[in-house]
UniProtKB/Swiss-Prot annotation:
<dbReference type="GO" id="GO:0005737">
    <property type="term" value="C:cytoplasm"/>
</dbReference>
<dbReference type="InterPro" id="IPR027417">
    <property type="entry name" value="P-loop_NTPase"/>
</dbReference>
<feature type="binding site">
    <location>
        <begin position="134"/>
        <end position="139"/>
    </location>
    <ligand>
        <name>GTP</name>
    </ligand>
</feature>
<keyword id="KW-0547">Nucleotide-binding</keyword>
<keyword id="KW-0694">RNA-binding</keyword>
<dbReference type="GO" id="GO:0005525">
    <property type="term" value="F:GTP binding"/>
</dbReference>
<dbReference type="GO" id="GO:0042254">
    <property type="term" value="P:ribosome biogenesis"/>
</dbReference>
<dbReference type="InterPro" id="IPR023179">
    <property type="entry name" value="GTP-bd_ortho_bundle_sf"/>
</dbReference>
<dbReference type="InterPro" id="IPR016478">
    <property type="entry name" value="GTPase_MTG1"/>
</dbReference>
<keyword id="KW-0690">Ribosome biogenesis</keyword>
<dbReference type="InterPro" id="IPR030378">
    <property type="entry name" value="G_CP_dom"/>
</dbReference>
<feature type="binding site">
    <location>
        <begin position="61"/>
        <end position="64"/>
    </location>
    <ligand>
        <name>GTP</name>
    </ligand>
</feature>
<dbReference type="GO" id="GO:0003723">
    <property type="term" value="F:RNA binding"/>
</dbReference>
<dbReference type="GO" id="GO:0006412">
    <property type="term" value="P:translation"/>
</dbReference>
<keyword id="KW-0342">GTP-binding</keyword>
<feature type="binding site">
    <location>
        <position position="178"/>
    </location>
    <ligand>
        <name>GTP</name>
    </ligand>
</feature>
<dbReference type="Pfam" id="PF01926">
    <property type="entry name" value="MMR_HSR1"/>
</dbReference>
Length: 284
């Protein structure tokens, strides 16, 4: 597969990395947020270096949008590596209580030692939530805090400044903008990030992204693809598949010619709004 180089390291991300590194000494535990649909592709390869030896829990967010069977496989995969991983949904709150409980258990011995050294009462756990843009960091913070504090949106990179937020008496959160590597070494990773909306639609050619997505759907979810677009069968030729979908859905330009840009936008919108059901693009 050809190497795809994309420069993607905005100034605010470089600043976030620097500030996170400076503040790690204040933090007890790290919540690493990933997209449950792409748990590996949405991880930052620098995260191990940045987090170093801090206790960590991987949160597979947007689990309500991911294939539940595949999500369970990923949770088991991380568990086999002695990494706690929890499937959550920051929108509905599924799994959120569990993440706090697991964090308390992971830090139990540390706090017991602090108490033994004379700390009169346990202080709040200090946690860092980190992840690439658009995996739901701000939504999770709002869910934990019970109010709208962090600015949220569907534009990657919307969270700009770090902030401490108290969540009851047990938890203090440092929200930090997502960190994404400066270039993708793997073309497929880029397409997965684009398909799920983790990177801006202006970064990659949308037709190329849709080609990737349709081929994936044809391989892993053919019945859903046929049902959604009323296809009798799925042609092997990708151009024919674009044509079939375009004609069925009226994605036409002047003269009745299929508008491939419109088809690409339709398919990606359908994926992102769950019109094709719960999908997982990273596979073990």
């Amino acid at each position: 597969m050809a190497t795809m180089t994309i420069q993607w390291f905005p100034g605010h991300m470089a600043k976030a990395k620097r500030e996170v590194t400076e503040k790690l000494k204040l933090i007890d535990i790290v919540f690493e947020l990933v997209d449950a649909r792409i748990p590996m592709s949405s991880r930052n390869p620098l995260i191990d270096e940045i987090v170093a030896n801090k206790p960590r829990i991987i949160l597979l967010n947007k689990a309500d949008m991911a294939d539940p069977d595949v999500t369970k496989q990923w949770v088991d995969f991380f568990a086999a590596q002695q990494i706690d991983a929890i499937a959550i949904d920051s929108q509905s709150g599924t799994g959120v209580k569990q993440m706090v409980a697991v964090a308390k258990e992971k830090l139990r011995s540390k706090f017991e030692k602090m108490m033994a050294k004379g700390m009169k009462r346990p202080r709040a756990m200090r946690a860092l939530i980190v992840g690439i843009p658009n995996v739901g960091k701000s939504t999770l913070i709002n869910r934990l805090a019970g109010k709208h504090i962090a600015k949220t949106g569907d534009t990657p990179g919307v969270t700009k400044a770090q902030q401490w937020i108290k969540v009851g008496k047990e938890l203090e959160l440092l929200d930090t903008p997502g960190i994404l590597w400066p270039k993708f070494e793997d073309e497929e990773v880029g397409y997965k990030l684009a398909t799920t909306g983790a990177i801006k639609d202006t970064i990659l050619n949308l037709q190329d992204v849709a080609v990737y997505a349709l081929r994936f759907l044809a391989a892993y979810y053919p019945d859903r693809l046929k049902e959604r677009y009323a296809l009798a069968d799925i042609p092997e030729d990708i151009v024919q598949l674009f044509d079939d979908i375009g004609k069925k859905r009226g994605c036409l330009a002047a003269g009745g010619v299929v508008d491939y840009d419109k088809v690409a936008e339709l398919v990606l919108r359908d994926i992102r709004t769950e019109k094709l059901g719960r999908l997982s693009f990273d596979r073990l």
